[in-house]
Regions:
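Non-catalytic regulatory/gating segments with a bias toward low-complexity or hydrophobic composition
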Residues: 1-2, 22-25
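Short beta-strands and strand-coil junctions in structured, solvent-facing domains, enriched
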Residues: 8-12, 30-33, 45-48, 131-132, ...
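N-terminal plug
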Residues: 8-17, 47-51, 473, 491
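A generic structural signal for short coil/turn motifs at secondary-structure boundaries
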Residues: 10-13, 130-134, 399-404, 425-426
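Short, glycine-/polar-rich solvent-exposed loops and beta-turns at beta-strand/coil boundaries
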Residues: 14-19, 136-139, 173, 428-433
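Residues embedded in well-ordered regular secondary structure
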Residues: 16-21, 29-134, 172-175, 192-221, ...
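Conserved small-residue
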Residues: 38-86, 339, 453, 563-661
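Extracellular/periplasmic, surface-exposed regions of secreted and cell-surface proteins
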Residues: 105, 140-142, 146-165, 178, ...
Length: 661
């Protein structure tokens, strides 16, 4: 695994690398040698650690009593154990109920057969994980073939073929009313997993008629609308299966002339997913759901990529090494899906949980893409006597999702290095084996903020009613209509990152100690984001994507590793790294009406605090904008004495309230 972080290294990979760098992964290949069969297996267990320890029933009652007393309110009857003794007895540790020890296993089998002219490798892997939450699992099957065939001394054909099948039953953990873990936090400890009267799932309190008759109520309102988490885990019938196929076919023609090689590669991938989730009626006390539903969707993704590359590498007079590359690439992506929701099933038996038994159904089809890109790539490299190194590259990308007049971008890069340790004046020694300084500059394009459907997202279909609020049609209601979903920007262009990097590489003590030091300065400009300023809500559609703003990231990275042998059979390797980065918005790109720099706002708010994160010029990206506090008031007297400019700024504050500054 190789990670390319600097823009000069990543530039040749284009917009697919985005602004974050490139990760290169080399997998196991077929090789020459006698036929071999290998097998390895791994077994283990998983447990969730550092779980929240919930209060027991007695502690919950005490907490409620204290909170109502501190607020000067009377205790509700549901939390008064003299009126509702049920609430004071612990019956369930909900965290213990929903979590378990999960068993996992891994199996890998590989067969390798190879000669001088051909090699084949076939492998099969099976992974299975029991989830740490009840009734969850994850299962993978992977079949892979890798073959290489040398037809003659010039022509080689290779094939990589992978089939993967993934099945899982995962669950939501933190959403209201459907998240099992958050439901376990809210469910009272006095409740039971199952109703002792009939074995159905228990609610927040008892449903025993004798108890209700004796105490006049089961006080269900005391616990709000909590949901039994075990019902969420066990009763919902989930099914999620994904099958994927990747194929890469390569043709290589070597030594067309000495040092010149041509490589053509075609990759195709196909992915299909089928998801099904049946949600039964939830009738226990707490948060009932009196209708059932079935969500079923499937999609198919097709993608292909072709690459044709000429490379030239040669050394002249044992000192001059020259390398050149020219490549063209093209890729295409499309995804088509169908989602059908059914509800009002008369019978919830598992063999009847199909859409044909639903009382009503609603269907949605969707298309992502098609998206296409074409690129031209060139690179020249020169080194002299393994001391001086210079590399220059250029890439032109054409992106189908950008407007026609701005759909291409040019991204150059330069790298220079000096291996000082190979100079004649550098003394031979056993301490410093390599000393190399390097510098690089490069630009990389990024389209990650633009969806595949950007240019085709003008029209959307509504499946709900909408009433006009403005204009001559005000008050009119439309059903199932087509409308403009987003405004397109004909001037949208590439988001671009430009980066400088200065580095030192140092190997010491017979190459056992390796040190790499880097300083970088990265400027990202023409950021692609939704326009949030000067976009009236009365337009009725989402803000258009625009290029605005500039972000600077400066920092330092240090990596250090040590490797050594204990004897001929044993060795060890230790590594560590340190990094420091400073991020700020150097240009916000928009101005207020008074000419001052504007602000980018995030989406929505939290508990009546609007736009809890914002981006302002001179500040880090997406900074939190919250109300500052200085602890809590320790007494009513302290709250009454808390003033600013002679006035109380929190006139209703009492002991225990937050102190705002």
């Amino acid at each position: 695994i190789v990670v390319l972080k600097d823009a000069a290294s990543a530039a040749i990979y284009g917009a697919q690398s985005g602004a974050g760098g490139v990760v290169l992964v080399t997998t196991k290949k077929a090789k020459e040698g006698a036929p071999s069969l290998s097998y390895d297996a791994t077994f283990g267990i998983r447990q969730a650690m550092n779980l929240i320890e919930p209060l027991n029933a007695e502690e919950q009652v005490k907490m409620r009593q204290l909170s109502y007393a501190n607020a000067g309110l009377s205790l509700p009857a549901g939390w008064d154990t003299s009126k509702n003794p049920w609430v004071g007895t612990t019956r369930t540790d909900w965290m213990d109920e929903i979590f378990r020890t999960g068993f996992y296993q891994r199996h890998n089998v590989a067969l390798n057969v190879g000669t001088e002219n051909y090699s084949n490798r076939l492998s099969f892997a099976f992974d299975q994980d029991e989830g740490v939450l009840e009734n969850t699992f994850d299962k993978h099957f992977t079949l892979r073939y890798n073959g290489k065939f040398k037809l003659n001394k010039w022509v080689t054909i290779s094939e990589d073929l992978i089939w993967k099948n993934h099945e899982d039953r995962s669950v939501d953990t933190n959403s209201g009313y459907t998240g099992a873990v958050i439901a376990a936090m809210f469910m009272p400890a006095s409740a039971t997993v199952y109703n002792p009267l009939d074995g159905t799932y228990g609610g927040t309190t008892t449903e025993d008629p004798a108890y209700i008759a004796q105490y006049g109520s089961n006080f269900a309102d005391a616990h709000g609308d909590a949901v039994n988490p075990m019902r969420l885990l066990e009763a919902h019938n989930r099914y999620d299966k994904t099958s994927e196929v990747w194929s890469t076919t390569s043709l290589e023609i070597a030594n067309i002339v000495p040092g010149l090689k041509f490589t053509s590669r075609f990759t195709y991938s196909l992915e299909h997913q089928n998801y099904k989730n049946f949600s039964p009626i939830r009738d226990e006390v707490g948060k009932p759901e009196l209708s059932n539903s079935l969500n079923n969707y499937s999609y198919r993704t097709d993608a292909w990529k072709t690459e044709n590359t000429l490379t030239y590498d040669n050394t002249f007079n044992d000192k001059h090494t020259v390398g050149a590359l020219f490549s063209t690439t093209a890729d295409h992506y499309a995804m088509r899906g169908l989602e059908v929701d059914g509800k009002d099933f008369a019978d919830e038996s598992s063999y009847l949980q199909y859409l044909s038994y639903a009382g009503s159904t609603t269907a949605y089809d969707f298309l992502t893409g098609p998206d296409a890109n074409v690129s031209l790539i060139g690179r020249l490299a020169y080194s002299y006597d393994d001391r001086y190194f210079l590399t220059a590259s250029w890439r032109r990308d054409y992106a189908g999702r950008l407007p026609k007049d701005n759909n291409y971008g040019d991204f150059p890069a330069l790298t220079a290095a000096w291996k000082i340790s190979n100079e004649a004046f550098f003394p031979e020694n056993d301490v410093v084996n390599l000393l190399k300084v390097r510098a690089s500059w490069g630009r990389v394009g990024n389209l990650g903020s633009i969806g595949y459907n950007y240019k085709s997202a003008v029209l959307k279909k509504s499946s709900w009613s909408e009433q006009a609020q403005y204009g001559p049609e005000s008050g009119k209601v439309w059903e199932n209509f087509v409308y403009n979903g987003v405004a397109l920007n004909p001037n949208l262009t590439w988001e671009t990152s430009e980066q400088w990097d200065l580095g030192i590489d140092l190997d010491m003590f017979n190459n056992r100690l390796n040190v790499a030091l880097d300083y970088f300065d990265k400027r990202t400009f023409n950021l692609i984001q939704e326009q949030t300023m000067n976009w009236p809500n009365t337009i009725g559609i989402s803000g258009m994507l625009v290029n605005q703003g500039e972000i600077r990231n400066r920092g330092f990275e240090a990596q250090m590793s040590w490797k050594d042998k204990i004897n001929k059979d044993w060795s060890y390797f230790v590594s560590g790294n340190f990094s420091y980065i400073k991020n700020k918005v150097s240009d916000i790109g928009v101005k207020n009406q008074d000419g001052t720099p504007g602000v980018w706002t995030g989406e929505g708010g939290f508990r009546n605090i609007p736009y809890i994160y914002q981006t302002a010029q001179g500040q880090p990206l997406n900074s939190f904008y919250l109300i500052k506090t200085d602890g809590i008031f320790q007494s009513d007297a302290e709250a009454a004495a808390y003033v600013k400019d002679g006035k109380r700024i929190q006139p209703d504050a009492v002991a225990g309230d937050l102190k705002f500054v």
